[in-house]
Amino acid sequence: MINIYFNNNLCKQFHRGIKGYDVVADLFPELKNKAIAVKVNGESYDLSREITENCTFEVITTNSEEGLEIIRHDTAHIMAQAVKEIFPDTQITIGPTIKDGFYYDFATEHNFSSNDLEIIEKKMIEIINKNESFIREVWTREEAIKFFSSIGEDYKVKIISKIPNNENITVYKQGNFIDLCRGPHAPSTKTSKSFKLTKVSGSYWQGNSSNEKLQRIYGTAWRNEEELKSYLNNLIEIEKRDHRKIGKELELFHIQNEACGQVFWHKKGWTIYRTIENYIRKKLETNGYIEVKTPMLLNKELWEKSGHWDKFRENMFLSEAEDKVLAIKPMNCPCHIQIFNSKIRSYRDLPIRMAEFGICHRYEASGALHGLMRVRGFTQDDAHIFCTESQVISEALKFCNLLMEVYKDFGFTNILVKFSDRPENRAGSDETWDRAESALKKSVEAANLNYVLNPGDGAFYGPKLEFVLKDAIGREWQCGTLQMDFVLPERLGAYYVGSDGKKHHPIMLHRAILGTFERFIGILIEHHSGKFPIWLAPTQLSILTISEESIEYANSLKTKAEEHNIRVELDATNEKINYKIRNHIHKKIPVFWIVGKKEVNENSVSIRYLESNTQQVMPIDKALKTLLTCVSI
């Protein structure tokens, strides 16, 4: 007999070798139809797997996140089976679950198309409708290598060769299909009915571009058709909001192969960029920051001293001149320490809040680049606060308040804060980490911000806060950071003279609000679907003429608006007014002033807003005053 513990240490005895579904039926009969797997001593088991020792026991249901992940894992196996049945010469490699779905990488001479996805889906439905059981088997290494070699699955053999000798080799069967897998799986294929294959892309074996090219098929799977439909509708909305599409439509920017991963900002996009930069600059000035500018190209010796050479060398763009190796900076922090070190500092000088709109470059594989969201050349709204340990709480609190103020102005009010504490490999004593973590926690609490713990994810040099924005359609974007560093200042010889007359290393707070301008603008485009807040819109006002006799008056309105620094366009073309309105709606300009004979005679304008179908007549002075209120921030 074995003891099975459940529900906070309740215990019941069962025969050794009992299967998970029998335990569920006995202890949790109400979950019998919802169970998809179980946890035995914290390890996920199939419902059909035997339990042979005393253990803790939990039920994994389809309603849980773990249950949904199993459904997606099942569906990946079903897709691999379908592909093998349709394209027998294909080799299967790996097929993990990912956020919202799964993928599988295939080695094949056939180029998968969208038409193929439909064919594969039909075959998957056939497999699912057969209600094939997922059967787990444990094989020896020799058996596994012999079998997968015999069916030409070379990549599976490579995977097996990397599995430690003391680990079991497990495979799963469904029908005639066998795949290498740790599991767990649902009892049968019937739980995978709500799925959709979404796209095909290229990939490389083990993610290394020097290895063989593969083809990756992505899919999504859900508990039911309602969840699937909701997700697919969300995908349509994401596609509508794609910043690359909107960026082209609104003539904001473009990216081309001759400058891979770098942005060509067009006039309107550059207007948004400069508006954000000027806004942030004013916020920095108000909050006591000094703005600096540091070189882009630095001798590798500085990066060796800072420790970045060992960690970031592969991501640096390098150059040689006069027998010296130079690197384009991937970050700004070592440069800011050079400014701090340029003269002797006193404790009375601290805190020093040093900011830079720093242009940085990092090598990213071309396949990883994605519009503005992932680039090689970018500008950070970077700042470093040099302070004493006693100043950390107040400085971190001030930063949290500033960050929340900025996010609110950009239209983000749903912010998740993640607190990352000490990692296993770290510098500094436990006492130092205790004080550092306590200081960051106190600052977040003082700012009235809730946070979730991200255990062990801090940097080796100190704990950190990450600020995650939730956009208009519920996606999360990590932008802001606050990282505490008690290593780099010491490594680069930064010190101040304390009240005791002795040298002390400052604490360095790395902080950013936007992250990078490029990515943040991409997020803004998608969050607002290109319909920017009036203060941020590249064109804030369109003046539309109804007839030729109102052109002179419209020009005077344009001049008046420009005198108040309003970004304005005049459309005095010989088109019908409804056409003009549609055209400027397509441009997503937030405010229209429509002027005809009546408005000329009354010294007024007819106001229409982008999101409204109605118009309001208003005297020009009042209309201007109303607009100025909207564009100010």
From Swiss-Prot:
It catalyses: tRNA(Thr) + L-threonine + ATP = L-threonyl-tRNA(Thr) + AMP + diphosphate + H(+). It is found in: Cytoplasm. Residues 242-533 are annotated as: Catalytic. SMART domains: tRNA_SAD. Catalyzes the attachment of threonine to tRNA(Thr) in a two-step reaction: L-threonine is first activated by ATP to form Thr-AMP and then transferred to the acceptor end of tRNA(Thr). Also edits incorrectly charged L-seryl-tRNA(Thr). Homodimer. This is Threonine--tRNA ligase. It comes from Ehrlichia canis (strain Jake).
